[in-house]
From Swiss-Prot:
It comes from the Eukaryota. It is an enzyme of class 2 (transferase). CDD domains: RING-CH-C4HC3_LTN1 (cd16491). Pathway: Protein modification; protein ubiquitination. One of its GO terms (biological process) is ribosome-associated ubiquitin-dependent protein catabolic process. A zinc finger (RING-type) spans 1823-1870. It catalyses: S-ubiquitinyl-[E2 ubiquitin-conjugating enzyme]-L-cysteine + [acceptor protein]-L-lysine = [E2 ubiquitin-conjugating enzyme]-L-cysteine + N(6)-ubiquitinyl-[acceptor protein]-L-lysine. Its EC number is 2.3.2.27. It is found in: Cytoplasm, Cytosol. It comes from Arabidopsis thaliana. Component of the ribosome quality control complex (RQC), composed of at least the E3 ubiquitin ligase LTN1 and NEMF. The complex probably also contains TCF25 as well as CDC48 and its ubiquitin-binding cofactors. RQC forms a stable complex with 60S ribosomal subunits. SMART domains: RINGv (SM00744). This is E3 ubiquitin-protein ligase listerin. InterPro entries: ARM-like, ARM-type_fold, LTN1/Rkr1, LTN1_E3_ligase_6th, Ltn1_N, LTN1_UBC, RING-CH-C4HC3_LTN1, Znf_RING.
Length: 1873
């Protein structure tokens, strides 16, 4: 292995190949790598000799490890190894890489042919880093890697080839290929020199590759498909690489850079010689590459085409005659190639071969081998390569020898097949364009080159004519006109349209363009040829006219119109006369008489388009050429007609023909007329037309209708004429060019006439005025005439308004009449008819109103009239039209209003912006005054709807008008002007209260009604526009000027559709929070309200008996308007922190200053000060406490409070008070200064503000009330004393409770019990009275129902003051109870004087009374409901009247003890009314007029002990037994059948008798709420019963048998399953929508707790989301209590999408908790038997039950599915010992039956199965019907024995057998049973 021979002879002047290679490489690290490979045996050769190569052992260990991993078969391992190797190579430079290169080169050659493209790409990345790091040191290896390097550039995978090209890119263009080899050889000459240097090695490498086969490609065992793919990749890349290399090396040298030619010429010459010799060798050895042409691989065939093209271009000398003969069929007959990826290289090869070797055509049968395949190729749309193949067709015609085809047949077949391929291109407009472009080029080429195919001139002409006739006329033109050979019957034409793209508009346009270009080309070539096409088309057209088939004629004319439009579009007319003189002129000349006589619509359109295209003065001579008329002079052809002659022809022929008659063709004839208008003759022609129309008087001619259509056409003509380049310069481009005195005079006379109100008159006026749309502003009358027309229209509108039945509309009319309008209200014309006429005109010309902007008065009046009529139209829905006469009267009037409403709908922002600002402002002012009049005057309309309508209309108009802020404020100010009816509480000018004394009651009530209605209007405006528009509208006068409006609204209190607390006050608060300077406004409001209350409180002396107001609910109890407004206003100010301590102190000072007038007390102030003190006392005390130690801050409040306490102490005890004395006011004042709270923290905070002296005085005042017990009779006679006493007790307990002694507590309790007991007595008497009344009328006739309900109302209406007294007592007791509970929980030293042994019995006794109140109201409603639902509603409405009282009752009922409830129930049952305690609870819960707190209380009592056991099952049933099912074995006696069990009627109707109509109700409907509550109760009751007891099993069986599963469907109407679509299931709880999270949490909580009480507690007020939560909780309870029931429902679902969503919801949110609960219960279960054990696997959700008996045993595996319990539990036998297969199968089936049918815990099912197995071992025989000892449903034993065969059966099984078989025979022996 020595050195190579010849080294010694090498001269110094000749460098070695390695040194030359090194010179080509840049220094440093600018080298990169390409794509290489291996061929034949060379793949195993190293690139260096043994002497120069580095030892493998010298490699870095890590590099060596990765190189070794490259020989692995796994592509993933290779990719990871290459990635690691790439990083290692990056870290090395220069000489460090030399040891790596030999081994890497070896691996590189193997890797470039790897099957995985990722491996090949990663290989090039490593090679890039190797060459980059090695730099010039890679030179010795260059020749060995250049072949693979070059080969790698052409990998079929683009990402791999790009990775290779990124390092070796040749930046020169060779032929059509650009190859970039940049990084390794950045200089262009070095790149070329590198290829020259290594050319021999590259050719050798490629030659070796081409010799390989799939069998010898690899030494590894690979799959055949992988081998085939690798082979195709290698061959195609080698072929393309070879073609590219030949193009580069054998190209013509570039002489522009000849400076270095001498130095490089030898190397280049050598490379060219090597290339030529190698090419000859390979061409010969591979037999012209014919085998590759026949390959099944498209990539190999495409590469072969490219290679042959390169050979033809670069080494044509290699082609011998035999080679040409061999290749001719393969290349010229190549049109069988159907793979579009090959077509580009295919066409290049075919064209080059045919051009280079034209003699090749003689070696084959052209028709058979070429043309047949070419026709097929064209018919198939070039097999998907239209963009490539169609442009090549003309080149193919050029190179195809003429003598090889028959010209007369060739071209016809060529174009037929070419155009047949259009059906394959219909999806792409680009492909269609390519097809038609090729058609045009090839056709014109055929005409120009006809001489190539013919020697004789006549033959040339005949060929050209033949082409025009057979191709242009019969194919292209026929296709364009959708005709074939002259005509296609309609039935065949329809089928023809469905083929290809004949009916495609875009295709037809392009086809027409193609025909036009061909015709233009023919005209340039020889004009005489054009006549053959024109004559053929004309003859065909005229033949159709003669045949008379109008449908075919119309279609042909439409296509001719299309062709004319294309002529105009593509500007074919420029400089060419043939379109008219040769084509259209003769055709129109002969067709005009037929068109004129037939008046075919499309024929007239054809004339119009022809005139438009060519011009009237050119077309008219053609049309009249054959008409002999004495009045017409002859016209010389081909010359424009003179204006005079044109006018004469226009007058005598075209005007009469186009304007006579009015039919379907009139529009088309008028279009023709307009097209004939010549610019020079325009004025005369238009005047002639107008005169002719108005002068026609013959019968049947409608002048106005004809003019209307004519004017619309004129409007379009104006638009068309003004859109050109000469804008507004051309005659007829401006509206005034079309004005005519006859038009104006006719329009004016029509609008002022009372008889001309026809539809045609309306349409004529609308067409004259214009303005039908926003853009239609063209009018045909002058401005003065326009004003006269609209004055006439306005007069008609005002006459209509004047006769309005609404007084406000009628009243407003007078303000709209202006002097310029001659308005005669006494006219006898039909107002409805003329108003309808005017409305229709305005509707059709609305936007022409903008032209009246200069006449502001007229336009304002017109717009205002429209506003008023439109509002009347909107108000008609509020009129009571119960009388038929009223309906009839309004019917015609509404018809007019509807038109005006349509006008108003057009008034948008864009319209109003076009109107003069002064007009907009005046219109707004008129509208404001009109709306004000409507609200104040219309007493008979629905008030709320009326005010809402007026406010909405005002808001809409203000938004449209876009007025300035100041003008808008002025408009709002107009609405607040004072009138006779409004305001009624405060004067706007003086802000003083208005005195209404002495006003008649009826008038006063009327004024209040109007005022409430107007406040409703203002409030609606505030809601829509914002309160700032009215409160701070006039900033010049400040806030105070508008404070009166706030006071007026506050005093009004309620109005239609709103009230102060829910509407105005929230808006005011929000405004004041956002407006820092609103303090002055609030102070002004307070001042006005306080002064008004002081003045008016004396009027409400009797209404102030009870001042203890719930500020959130019952503030309406304050009757006096100013005081009520003042209290609510102060309450909201402090509640929302708008006022604080400072403002409270200022108010305190103001009110106390008014308390005394000199030495006398102001009685009015004394009456109202308690209300104010009750609100401001808390911030006052806070202010005093925070004021520090200064005495000045302590004196005012503390001194006054002490004085008031001392003043109250000076009075006798309340029990001695007599009516008429004024001590009540002082007591109320004192009590108001000591607020109480049932919240302990607030109570302690209040107590801390009290000084010792105050507490002492307060306690003394309380104890003073215990004096003189003999006055008890007075107490019962004065309810006010009871109220004050109850409140004083509350205060004393709250503030002085720790100082109470035993007597004090006795006094408190005795009074509370007495007051509450008095209400109990009243309620019990009411219940008894209702019971007696209903019992007495139950048999009465239905006619007396109204009397019965009236009598019932008298009974339940309780006016007894004991209810109010008891309400205060309940408040006191509730407060005391809260304080005691807080003491017991927190262990605080509060109320230490009250011992538990004292409190507990008193509490129970009082709560018993409260429960009796609760049951009484329920009993009363239940008894009334037994008569009718209306009766029950009357009872329920009484509770709403005493809402606060019953809410206190409900709160205390929930807090009552089980013992108190039990005693109350017993008392009710002992009472003996017609309804019991449970019925009363259901009556409250399902009340028709429910109170949420009472409903919750009823549910709580029904769902908890001791009532829950009585709540579900009907009274006639035996109580549900708690006896264990284990005790049933001994005897069956005493076990009642489940068939006897009945649910209570209240529950049964919602469980068993559920109606499908429930699914159609609203999601918050009362029916749904009641149903869900009933089911929640039922499920909670079942869950509370002990497991495996008779009672629970009977109830469960009854539910499963009778309950309607519709409940589950209704539940999932609430649960938002749609939120589970998509990816929702994969999200965590925090990511899912909140609506779904709440429902899921409710379901999970119900499963865990076994109760839905927490969800029910938050149910009210009823909302959709809360109902969804309850639905989720009920579903969770069902899954826990009735799993088998739910599973049966789920299994019967047919909606797959819904079932999958339900399963997903259950699996995610319910199943985990259920499975955890089941496994936990099984784990805790005590089976009490050594023979039975259970083991649990929580991870696998499995339970293994092991049963052993007498050396036999069996393991049963119970597996819970992830969507348990919707999917059944799976049971398998894991192991069995000593048990027969039959018994094993039997036990397995029995376990499956028990666990799958168990409605309860699985632990219960396992326990029952264990008992079943025990019984079998004890010898108990199983039931022959169900094959089980224990029945799976009722768990009974077989006890019914057949008297004949003695077998025993379960009773349930035997009953079912009898039922299904319809005979009572033993199932076994068939003997009678």
């Amino acid at each position: 292995m020595g050195k190579p021979k010849g080294d010694a002879a090498r001269s110094k002047a000749r460098p070695s190949s390695s040194s030359l290679a090194a010179s080509l490489l840049p220094s440093g690290s600018a080298a990169a790598v390409g794509f290489g490979g291996y061929v034949g045996s060379s793949r195993f050769q190293t690139s260096l000799s043994n002497e120069d190569s580095a030892s493998f052992l010298d490699l870095d260990s890590e590099v060596a490890q990765h190189l070794q991993r490259l020989s692995r078969k796994d592509p993933t391992t290779k990719i990871k190894a290459l990635a690691s190797l790439s990083e290692l190579v990056k870290q090395k430079q220069g000489k460090e890489l030399l040891p790596i290169i030999p081994q890497w080169t070896f691996e590189y050659k193997k890797l470039i042919l790897d099957y995985s493209r990722d491996v090949r790409r990663a290989t090039h990345d490593v090679m890039t880093n190797v060459v980059t790091g090695a730099g010039r040191d890679i030179a010795p290896h260059l020749k060995s890697i250049m072949g693979p390097w070059w080969f790698s550039q052409f990998d079929l995978a683009s990402e791999v080839s790009q990775a290779a090209k990124s390092s070796f890119q040749v930046g020169s263009s060779f032929g059509n290929s650009v190859f970039l080899v940049e990084a390794a050889f950045p200089a262009q000459e070095k790149r070329l020199h590198a290829l020259n240097l290594c050319s021999a090695e590259i050719f050798a490498y490629l030659e070796e590759n081409l010799k390989l086969t799939p069998q010898n490609l690899s030494d590894k065992s690979l799959a055949s498909d992988e081998l085939e793919e690798m082979y195709q990749q290698m061959i195609s890349s080698s072929l393309v690489g070879l073609a590219t290399l030949l193009d580069i090396l054998l190209r013509e040298p570039d002489n522009t850079g000849s400076a270095n030619i001498n130095s490089e010429s030898k190397l280049a010459s050598k490379a060219r010689a090597v290339a030529t010799s190698s090419a000859e060798k390979m061409f010969s050895s591979h037999k012209c590459f014919l085998n590759f042409l026949k390959s099944e691989s498209p990539s190999i065939r495409s590469a072969t085409y490219s290679l042959l093209s390169s050979f033809i271009k670069n080494v044509p000398e290699v082609f011998g005659e035999g080679d040409v003969r061999s290749l001719a069929p393969a290349l010229l007959g190549v049109f069988r190639e159907n793979n579009p990826t090959c077509h580009s290289s295919m066409w290049e090869a075919v064209l080059l071969f045919s051009k280079k070797f034209p003699q090749s055509w003689v070696y084959l049968n052209v028709h058979k081998s070429v043309l047949n395949h070419l026709w097929q190729f064209l018919r198939n749309g070039c097999y998907g390569s239209p963009q490539v193949s169609y442009p090549a067709l003309i080149l193919f015609l050029e190179v195809m020898p003429a003598q090889s085809v028959e010209s007369d047949k060739f071209f016809v077949n060529f174009f037929k097949n070419l155009l047949a391929g259009r059906s394959m291109c219909e999806s792409s407009s680009t492909d269609q364009l390519s097809l038609l472009r090729a058609t045009t080029e090839c056709f014109l080429w055929g005409l120009r080159n006809a001489s190539r195919y013919c020697d004789v001139p006549n033959s040339i002409h005949d060929l050209q004519v033949d082409l025009i006739d057979k191709v242009l006329v019969k194919i292209l033109w026929a296709d364009f006109t959708e005709l074939s050979k002259g005509s296609i019957p309609p039935n065949q034409r329809k089928s023809a349209e469905n083929l290809g793209m004949g009916n495609s508009v875009s295709y037809l346009q392009e086809l027409g363009r193609c025909i036009l270009e061909i015709l233009s080309g023919i005209n340039l070539l020889e004009q005489n040829l054009l006549s053959f096409f024109c004559k053929a088309v004309q003859e065909s057209f005229l033949n159709m006219l003669q045949q008379g088939d109008l449908e075919i004629v119309a279609g042909s004319m439409r296509k001719m119109i299309d062709f004319l439009l294309l002529l105009e579009r593509y500007s074919v007319l420029e400089g060419e006369s043939w379109p008219l003189h040769q084509f259209m002129g003769p055709l129109l000349s002969k067709a005009f008489p037929w068109i004129r006589s037939s008046e075919l619509l499309d024929g007239v359109k054809l004339l119009s388009v022809s005139v438009s295209v060519f011009g009237p003065r050119k077309v008219v001579p053609v049309l009249i050429d054959d008409i002999e008329t004495s009045t017409l002079l002859s016209v010389e052809k081909e010359k424009n007609m003179s204006p005079e002659k044109l006018i004469k022809v226009f007058q005598e022929i075209f005007i009469p023909w186009c304007m006579d008659g009015y039919d379907s063709s009139t529009a088309a004839r008028q279009d023709l007329l307009f097209s004939l208008l010549d610019d020079e003759c325009f004025t005369q022609q238009w005047s002639d037309v107008i005169s002719y129309v108005f002068n026609q008087q013959h019968q049947g001619f409608n002048n106005l209708a004809a003019m209307k259509m004519l004017l619309e056409k004129a409007r379009d003509e104006i638009t068309k004429r003004s859109s050109g380049q000469e804008l507004n310069q051309r005659i007829g481009s401006r509206p005034e060019h079309w004005h005519h005195t006859l038009i104006e005079s006719t329009a004016i006379s029509l609008v002022h006439s009372s008889s001309a109100t026809t539809t045609s008159a309306v349409q004529f006026l609308c067409s004259v005025l214009g303005g039908s749309t926003q853009d239609s502003s063209i009018s045909f009358v002058s401005r003065s005439s326009l004003v006269l027309i609209y004055r006439g229209i306005l007069e008609k509108l005002l006459s209509f308004i004047k006769q309005s039945p609404l007084c406000s509309v009628n009243d407003t009319c007078s303000s709209l009449i202006v002097e310029a309008i001659a308005f005669d209200s006494s006219s006898s014309v039909d107002v409805i008819v003329v108003a309808k006429f005017a409305a229709e005109v305005i509707d059709g010309s609305f936007f022409s109103l903008k032209s009246l902007s200069q006449d502001a008065t007229l336009l304002t009046t017109v717009l205002s009239s429209i506003f008023i009529i439109d509002l009347e139209n909107r108000m008609t829905s509020l009129v009571d039209n119960t009388l038929s006469e009223s309906k009839e009267k309004r019917k015609d009037r509404n018809f007019v209003c509807d038109y005006v409403h349509a006008v108003c709908s057009k008034m948008d922002n864009q319209f109003w912006k076009s109107i003069n600002y002064d007009v907009r402002k005046s219109s707004a002012s008129t509208l404001a005054q009109f709306l004000r009049s409507v609200v104040l005057l219309e007493d008979d309309l629905q008030p709320f709807e009326l005010t809402l309508l007026c406010a909405s209309r005002m808001t809409e108009v203000l938004e449209y008008l876009s007025l300035d802020q100041s003008d808008e404020e002025n408009i709002c100010g107009l609405l607040l002007l004072e009138s006779d009816a409004w305001p009624i509480w405060v004067s706007p000018s003086s802000s003083a209260s208005i005195d209404t004394h002495g006003m008649p009651v009826q008038l006063c009530e009327l004024r209040k009604s109007k005022s409430q209605r107007y406040v409703s209007f203002i409030d609606s405006l505030i809601m829509k526009l914002g309160i700032h528009r009215f409160i701070v509208g006039h900033k010049d006068h400040g806030f105070a000027s508008q404070a009166w409006l706030s006071v007026e609204i506050l005093c009004t209190w309620e109005w239609p559709g709103g009230k102060v607390q829910t509407s105005f006050l929230p808006n005011l608060v929000s405004f004041c929070k956002d407006e820092p300077s609103s303090g002055g406004l609030l102070n002004s409001i307070f001042d006005i309200l306080l002064n008004g209350a002081l003045v008016h409180v004396k009027d409400e002396e009797e209404g102030l008996g009870n001042m203890w107001v719930d500020f959130n609910n019952n503030i309406v109890d304050v009757v006096e308007p100013f005081l009520r407004a003042l209290v609510s206003f102060l309450h909201i100010l402090f509640k929302e922190d708008l006022w604080g301590e400072e403002e409270a102190m200022a108010a305190f000072k103001m009110i106390t200053d008014k308390l005394f007038i000199g030495e006398e007390t102001s009685k009015n102030c004394l009456r109202i000060i308690p209300y104010i003190m009750s609100i401001i006392i808390s911030p006052l005390r806070t202010k005093v406490k925070s004021g520090g130690s200064g005495k000045d801050t302590l004196l005012p409040l503390e001194v006054l409070l002490r004085n008031w306490l001392e003043r109250s102490l000076s009075f006798p005890p309340l029990v001695l008070w007599q009516s008429g004395e004024d001590i009540q006011d002082w007591f109320q004042l004192v009590i108001s200064c000591y607020p109480v709270s049932d919240k302990a923290e607030e109570a302690k905070e209040l107590q801390r503000h009290l000084s010792t002296e105050e507490r002492t005085l307060l306690l003394d005042l309380f104890r003073k009330q215990k004096q003189d017990p003999g006055a008890s009779t007075v107490v019962t006679q004065l309810p006010a004393v009871q109220i004050l006493l109850a409140r004083l007790i509350m205060i004393a307990v709250s503030y002085c409770g720790n100082d109470f002694n035993e007597d004090d507590w006795d006094f408190v309790f005795s009074n509370l019990k007495r007051l509450i007991q008095s209400a109990v007595v009243v309620m019990e008497e009411t219940s008894e009275n209702v019971n007696d009344f209903i019992s007495g009328v139950s048999s009465m006739e239905k006619e007396k129902e109204n009397d019965t309900l009236e009598g019932l109302g008298h009974i339940v209406f309780i006016s007894d003051p004991s209810i109010n007294s008891a309400q205060n007592a309940l408040s006191a007791f509730s407060l005391l109870n809260a304080l005691v509970n807080h003491k017991s929980v927190e262990g605080e030293d509060n109320l230490k004087s009250l011992a538990d042994e004292t409190w507990d019995p008193v509490k129970d006794r009082i709560l018993e009374g409260v429960l009796r109140l609760f049951f009484c109201t329920g009993l009363t409603e239940a008894i009334a409901a037994s008569y009718s639902p209306e009766a029950a509603s009357i009872v329920a409405s009484f509770r709403v009247d005493h809402l606060q009282f019953w809410e206190l009752v409900a709160h205390l009922v929930v807090d009552s003890s089980p013992r108190a409830r039990d005693r109350a129930v017993r008392a009710v049952e002992f009472w003996g009314l017609s309804r019991g305690s449970i019925s009363s609870l259901y009556a409250i819960m399902f009340s028709s007029n429910p109170i949420p707190s009472l409903q919750l209380a009823a549910y709580t009592v029904l769902s908890t002990e001791p009532i829950s056991r009585l709540a579900i099952v009907a009274d006639l049933n035996a109580p549900l037994n708690d006896e264990s099912l284990n005790d049933q074995d001994s005897s069956n006696a005493g076990l009642p059948s489940e068939d006897k069990l009945l649910l209570r009627d209240e529950v049964s109707c919602m469980v068993e008798k559920l109606d499908h109509e429930l699914l159609d109700t609203d999601l918050t409907a009362p029916e749904r709420v009641q149903t869900f509550l009933a089911w929640s109760l039922l499920l909670s009751n079942v869950n509370s019963l002990p497991s495996l007891t008779q009672g629970r099993e009977r109830l469960v069986q009854y539910i499963e048998k009778t309950a309607n599963p519709l409940i589950l469907d209704s539940l999932f109407q609430h649960i938002p399953l749609e939120l589970y679509m998509g990816q929702s299931l994969k999200k965590k709880d925090g990511d899912i929508p909140s609506e779904l999270s709440v429902v899921a949490s409710a379901a999970t909580r119900a499963i865990i707790t076994g109760s839905s009480l927490s969800t029910v507690e938050s149910l009210w007020p009823i909302e959709t989301g809360k109902m969804a939560s309850l639905a989720g909780a009920i579903y969770g309870l069902m899954l826990r209590v009735l799993p088998a029931y739910v599973r049966e429902w789920f299994s019967e679902m047919r909606d797959r999408s819904a079932s999958s969503l339900i399963e997903a919801f259950t699996r995610t949110w319910c199943s985990p908790s259920l499975i955890k609960n089941e496994l936990s219960q099984i784990k805790k279960a005590d089976f009490n038997d050594e023979s039975f054990s259970v083991s649990i696997s929580k991870a696998a959700n499995e339970v293994v039950a092991t049963y052993t008996k007498d050396e036999t045993g069996m393991d049963l595996v119970i597996r819970l599915p992830v969507s348990y319990p919707l999917k059944p539990v799976d049971v398998n036998c894991a192991k069995s010992i000593g048990i027969s297969e039959a018994k094993q199968r039997k036990w397995l089936m029995s376990m499956q039956m028990f666990v799958r049918h168990q409605n309860g815990a699985l632990a219960e099912a396992i326990r029952i199965w264990k008992r079943n197995s025990d019984k079998e071992f004890e010898g108990v025989e199983d039931c022959p019907i169900c094959y089980s000892v224990i029945h799976i449903g009722n768990h009974s034993l077989p006890r019914r024995a057949c008297v004949t065969c003695k077998y025993k059966f379960h009773k349930a099984c035997l009953d079912k057998w009898f039922y299904t078989s319809n005979k009572k025979l033993c199932p076994l022996c068939q003997s009678p049973c």
